[in-house]
Swiss-Prot record:
The modification N6-(pyridoxal phosphate)lysine is found at K226. It comes from Methanosarcina barkeri (strain Fusaro / DSM 804). PANTHER family: HISTIDINOL-PHOSPHATE AMINOTRANSFERASE, HISTIDINOL-PHOSPHATE AMINOTRANSFERASE-RELATED. Keywords: Amino-acid biosynthesis, Aminotransferase, Histidine biosynthesis, Pyridoxal phosphate, Transferase. Coiled coil: none annotated. CDD domains: AAT_like. It is an enzyme of class 2 (transferase). The keyword Transferase applies. Pfam families: Aminotran_1_2 (PF00155). InterPro entries: Aminotransferase_I/II_large, HisP_aminotrans, PyrdxlP-dep_Trfase, PyrdxlP-dep_Trfase_major, PyrdxlP-dep_Trfase_small. This is Histidinol-phosphate aminotransferase.
Length: 366
């Protein structure tokens, strides 16, 4: 007889709120009886151009070698990342699955039962999951009205048990950048690691990675899911002090980056034109959406915009758009985001025009 055995599960696991992803094309097609080919998916901040053709070819070329393990430490990819970022290989970690794998590895490396992590909200929901799984406790600090952080408030929330402070720049779901002076203040007044999530940094005017050369407690996480269009391959990387990278590699799961992901990542880094075009579409798209959507739209440095549909509710407006085959993200699942915010990915001009018309209709009908 097979019985449920919850006593075998770590108690910390039961405190974890399940991660809520954006809706899939299949879900919406089934729910509303739509042709999947007609659906516009702008809820997960994916690249509307798709992956680089060079990356696609590189993936295909690995098929005959599926029986062979990739390099344990993804050294070829790290060498390519060194050329891309300007950092030595000794400062670079490649991670699968995606940047989430980097977060998992970092929490596993430093968090013990009873330790704390600081999470300014609203922000990317995943940070607390690996921390809780390792026995850590998330301490949430509410962002200001404009979604900026108050460094003093953040530092006041730390304690002797604080191991990681999670920051996001551009922040998800608000799209605003973390000022360098605020990051420096946090770094200089804590013994904890400070993790800066730069998943969307290629779309922004500036990055914060260079500070890794100055501070031995700064880690910058990045992904191939956004500008490189490789979300389905689950590939990320970290830029961190050499002392930490050595220990991370010691504790990391070997072969975490698959051979197709490794080769596609190298090829994507080499395709400068695809990257430039992806950035151009995102920047033009977010500008268009900010100007045309008939609700308050926050300034963004990412490949998405945050829309406040007050006095309407985000769920109702999101549902109105989904009925028309347009997937956007209601932000009510983001802690402290409230119930009136919607995140919409910047798509192609044709897609953006349809999104604007759908928001206009929702404003009249919802």
């Amino acid at each position: 007889m097979f019985l449920s055995r919850p006593e075998l599960i770590k108690k910390e696991i039961f405190d974890i709120a399940e991660y809520v992803p954006g809706k899939s094309i299949e879900e919406i097609a089934s729910a509303y009886g739509l042709d999947p080919a007609s659906i516009i998916k702008l809820g997960s901040n994916e690249n509307p151009l798709g992956p680089s053709p060079k990356a696609v070819q590189a993936m295909m070329d690995t098929a005959p070698f599926a029986n062979i393990y990739p390099s344990a430490d993804a050294i070829e990819l790290r060498e390519a990342l060194s050329r891309y970022t300007g950092f030595p290989v000794s400062n670079l970690i490649a991670s699968g699955p995606g940047m989430d794998g980097l977060l998992d590895g970092l929490c596993r490396l430093v968090i013990e039962k009873g330790d704390e992590v600081i999470v300014p909200t609203p922000t990317f929901a995943y940070y607390e999951l690996p921390a809780r799984a390792c026995g850590g406790k998330p301490v949430f600090v509410r962002r200001s009205q404009d979604f900026s952080i108050d460094p003093e408030k953040l530092l006041e929330a730390t304690s002797s048990r604080t191991k990681i402070i999670f920051l996001c720049s551009p922040n998800n779901p608000s799209g605003n950048l973390l000022p360098e002076k605020d990051l420096r203040k946090v770094l200089e007044n804590t013994r904890a690691l400070v993790f800066v999530d730069e998943a969307y940094v290629e779309f922004a005017d500036r990055n914060l990675a260079e500070l890794v050369r100055e501070y031995d407690n700064l880690v910058v996480g990045r992904t191939f899911s956004k500008v490189f269009g490789l979300a389905g391959l689950r590939l990320g990387y970290g830029i961190m002090p050499e002392w930490l990278a050595k220990e991370y590699i010691r504790a990391a799961t070997p072969f975490s980056v698959s051979l197709p992901a490794l080769k596609a990542g190298i090829a994507a880094l080499s395709d400068v034109e695809h990257r430039k075009k992806s950035i151009e579409i995102a920047r033009e798209g977010r500008k268009y959406l900010k100007e045309k959507i008939p609700f308050k739209v926050y300034p963004s440095q990412a490949n998405f915009v945050l829309v406040d549909v007050s006095p309407l509710k985000a769920k109702a407006v999101t549902q109105s758009l989904m009925k028309k085959g347009i997937i956007v993200r209601s932000c009510d699942s983001f802690r402290d985001a409230g119930d009136t915010l919607i995140r919409a990915t910047a798509g192609t001009l044709e897609q953006n025009e349809k999104v604007v018309r759908a928001f206009e209709t929702a404003k009249k009908e919802v």
